[in-house]
């Protein structure tokens, strides 16, 4: 692949080098007309940003390069688009724009000077037009991640200069044309993630193919034999072939240039796995995940150039052999989701001298003490095992260690004092004791600290204020005795704070009782089942970021998503949602929740709750709140789950709650509410238990009928109505994101949180990432 990359990079460099800064007026006008055909994201509305991807020839002034930033264009790409008037284009990249399920236009065939055409992730539908054959100068054609259908086109018939062809992640069907393997210069071919079937023929070994990906198709017959004739292959992916016969690993011995082999999701013959077979000695990356292997493969011992090995999701049991740590170049090793119980060799030295930097041994049955980790370790995941004893202090000497996940084990003793050295620390669900070390140094890089479900005592360490990058802090289900950590609002990036089931106590409002809580970025605050007391000021929620969250405020889709090389980590947390308390993973970045339940809070629910426009879940149950349910709840338009049960609330339920279209769960039981239950569709569908324990309530879903069915709501006096209007006016002034919040509600309504139980392991996306 390196030669191919160099050639393509050289082409782009040449195109830019021969370009002038100025284009002919008619070309500039054509580009502007093309721009005006689409809706734009804010980053692309500026002409300077848009034209930064336009390059013109220094002699003719014609546009030769058009490379638009991903996500700028949104709309239909029509056959008469101004784009197709740019007949001198040599390089066109429109990837990652949204063309709204447009068909791939035959007008692309008019751009017959194109050498590079990149149309990845555009939403194109239908078949590839035959006019693509007119682009005889193409060296690279990328059409992946679209919705293209039909048989694989014979478009390559005239494209004799192609170096790279990527048709992956589409809906192509039928067989692979043999002409794909006779192209004189084709070095890269990716047909993965389609619906291809049947077999294909390769007449000779003259093909220049070095990179071939046929994974995740529906081949029903043998396709490996013809592939073995491609003797120049360096990269080969045959994952999830769905063939009826197991694969014999020894058949790959003719491919001596092979450095990368992906067979995950296939069945392998037992003899080839457990024998000293002849295997390509230049192998660097070998992916055998989910291959039904039950013993550690012996042939791996001879692969001295191997640097990435994936044996995850197999049935391997017993001890990890000590020779695996002696492979001189091994950097990434994934043994997760097997049945390993231990390690051969001394725990002090067996791993310590290894070159491994990324190690995943999660979801196994390891027991006993934890071995000293490799000296160069960067990412270490050992969650969901049965390790016991102390966490080895040697982790503090691993200066490269970035991610440490030892959660769901049986570790005892204290937390090592070096947690501020790491980006991710997850020690959840162990038996750790003592205080959380107060040794987070200035400039600590910690982003996630999860020590929930242990036996920790003392106070929250004030040195956490040095962790300016921290996003996720969870100390739930411990024995921490402290006041409400209002001082944490000085952390500029804190998004999730979980204090559930400890001995936190005292008031939650600031000392002057006037200021708002004002965490700058907090989205999830879970402080239930503590001993908090006092009341909340009216403006308590006035300055929270939850009021204006947008769906794509960040690049990450999931909260706490951390990726490094081949390692993926996502934060998980326990939340009560729609009446269920479960562990939640894959939390979308715009998800927001507040849980104050099970405390001793009193007074009225602050009217400022109505400012939290994008709040999705709110639980204030089992406190001593009094007064009316604020009518400002009607402004929390994204609310899906509301629990106010077990308080002393009085008056009527605001009829406006019946118009909250996403409210799928409401519980106001065991209060002192009166009057008619709102009759919105969402509320009528609730069980009657959600309204029981209020002697004055009537109407569906309760059996008590109301005497005056048409009586309007009169719970709020005129002065309070004026106050609510003031809150609504304040909400308008609190940010332009309010209207956009209504739009993302449609996505929120479809979003189902990733509920799962930890022991189910396979749903938790942690471990070494497939290339």
UniProtKB/Swiss-Prot annotation:
- Note the InterPro entries from the entry: Leu-rich_rpt (IPR001611), Leu-rich_rpt_typical-subtyp (IPR003591), LRR_dom_sf (IPR032675), RLP23-like (IPR046956)
**Keyword Cell division, does the record have it?**
no
> Carbohydrate attachment sites?
46, 58, 80, 93, 134, 158, 204, 242, 292, 337, 344, 353, 379, 384, 397, 410, 421, 466, 481, 543, 619, 622, 635
Instruction: Spell out the SMART domains in the cross-references.
Output: LRR_TYP
- Transmembrane annotation, as ranges: 730-750
The UniProt family comment states: Belongs to the RLP family.
Subcellular location, in the record's words?
Cell membrane
| A GO CC term attached to the entry | plasma membrane
Q: What is this protein called?
A: Receptor like protein 22
Spans of repeat LRR: 86-110, 112-135, 136-159, 160-183, 185-206, 207-230, 232-254, 255-281, 283-303, 304-327, 329-350, 353-377, 378-397, 398-419, 420-443, 445-467, 469-491, 492-516, 519-543, 588-612, 613-636, 637-660, 662-685
Alphabetized, the UniProt keywords read:
Cell membrane, Glycoprotein, Leucine-rich repeat, Membrane, Receptor, Repeat, Signal, Transmembrane, Transmembrane helix
Organism's domain of life?
Answer: Eukaryota
Give the record's membrane topology: Single-pass type I membrane protein
């Amino acid at each position: 692949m390196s030669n191919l990359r160099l050639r393509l990079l050289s082409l782009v460099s040449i195109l830019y080098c021969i370009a002038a800064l100025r284009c002919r007026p008619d070309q500039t006008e054509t580009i502007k007309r093309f721009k005006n055909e689409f809706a734009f994201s804010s980053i692309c509305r500026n002409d300077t940003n848009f034209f930064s991807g336009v390059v013109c020839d220094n002699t003719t002034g014609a546009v030769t390069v058009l490379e638009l930033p991903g996500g700028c264009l949104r709309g239909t790409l029509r056959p008469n688009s101004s784009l197709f008037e740019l007949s001198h284009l040599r390089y066109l990249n429109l990837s990652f724009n949204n063309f709204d399920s447009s068909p791939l236009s035959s007008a692309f065939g008019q751009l017959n000077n194109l050498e590079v055409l990149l149309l990845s992730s555009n939403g194109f539908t239908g078949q590839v037009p035959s006019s693509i054959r007119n682009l005889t100068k193409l060296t690279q054609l990328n059409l992946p991640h679209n919705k293209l259908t039909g048989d694989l086109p014979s478009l390559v018939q005239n494209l004799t200069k192609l170096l790279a062809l990527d048709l992956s992640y589409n809906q192509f069907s039928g067989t692979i044309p043999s002409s794909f393997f006779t192209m004189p210069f084709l070095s890269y071919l990716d047909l993965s993630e389609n619906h291809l079937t049947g077999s294909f023929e390769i007449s000779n070994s003259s093909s220049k193919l070095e990179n071939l990906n046929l994974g995740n198709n529906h081949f029903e017959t043998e396709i490996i034999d013809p592939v073995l004739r491609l003797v120049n292959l360096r990269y080969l992916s045959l994952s999830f072939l769905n063939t009826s016969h197991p694969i014999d690993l020894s058949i790959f011995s003719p491919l001596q240039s092979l450095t990368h082999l992906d067979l995950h999701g296939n069945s392998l013959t037992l003899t080839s796995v457990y024998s000293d077979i002849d295997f390509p000695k230049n192998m660097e990356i070998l992916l055998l995940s989910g291959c039904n292997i039950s013993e550690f493969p012996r042939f791996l011992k001879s692969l001295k150039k191997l640097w990435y090995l994936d044996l995850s999701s197999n049935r391997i049991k017993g001890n990890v052999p000590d020779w695996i740590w002696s492979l001189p170049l091994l950097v990434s090793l994934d043994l997760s989701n097997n049945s390993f119980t231990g390690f051969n060799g001394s725990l002090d030295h067996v791993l310590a001298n290894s070159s491994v930097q990324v190690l995943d041994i999660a979801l196994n049955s390891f027991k006993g003490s934890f071995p000293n980790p490799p000296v160069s370790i960067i990412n270490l995941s050992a969650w969901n095992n049965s390790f016991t004893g102390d966490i080895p202090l040697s982790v503090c000497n691993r200066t490269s260690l970035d991610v440490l996940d030892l959660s769901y084990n049986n570790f005892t003793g204290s937390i090592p004092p070096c947690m501020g050295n790491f980006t991710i620390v997850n020690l959840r669900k162990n038996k750790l004791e003592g205080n959380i070390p107060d040794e987070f140094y200035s400039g600590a890089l910690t982003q996630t600290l999860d020590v929930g479900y242990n036996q920790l005592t003392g106070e929250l360490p004030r040195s956490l204020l040095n962790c300016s990058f921290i996003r996720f802090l969870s100390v739930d289900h411990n024995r921490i005795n402290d006041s409400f950590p209002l001082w944490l609002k000085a952390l500029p990036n804190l998004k999730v704070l979980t204090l559930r089931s400890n001995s936190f106590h005292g008031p939650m409002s600031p000392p002057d009782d006037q200021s708002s809580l004002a965490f700058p970025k907090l989205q999830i605050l879970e402080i239930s089942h503590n001993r908090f007391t006092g009341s909340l000021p009216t403006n308590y929620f006035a300055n929270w970021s939850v009021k204006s969250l947008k769906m794509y405020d960040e690049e990450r889709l999931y909260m706490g998503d951390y990726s490094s090389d081949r390692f993926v980590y996502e934060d998980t947390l326990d939340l009560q949602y729609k009446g269920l308390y479960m562990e939640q993973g894959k939390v979308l970045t715009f998800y927001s929740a507040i849980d104050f339940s099970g405390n001793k809070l009193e007074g009225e629910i602050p009217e400022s709750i109505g400012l939290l426009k994008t709040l999705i879940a709110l639980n204030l149950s089992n406190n001593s709140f009094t007064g009316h349910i604020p009518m400002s709840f009607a402004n929390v338009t994204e609310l899906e789950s509301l629990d106010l049960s077990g308080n002393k609330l009085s008056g009527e339920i605001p009829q406006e709650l019946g118009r909250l279209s996403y409210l799928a769960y409401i519980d106001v039981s065991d209060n002192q509410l009166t009057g008619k239950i709102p009759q919105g569709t969402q509320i009528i569908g609730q069980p009657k238990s959600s309204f029981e324990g209020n002697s004055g309530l009537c109407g569906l879903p309760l059996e008590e009928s109301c005497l005056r069915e048409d009586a309007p709501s009169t719970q709020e006096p005129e002065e309070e109505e004026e106050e609510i209007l003031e809150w609504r006016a304040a909400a308008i002034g609190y940010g332009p994101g309010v209207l956009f919040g209504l739009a993302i509600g449609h996505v929120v309504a479809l979003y189902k949180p990733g509920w799962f139980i930890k022991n189910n392991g396979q749903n938790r996306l942690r471990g070494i990432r497939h290339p």
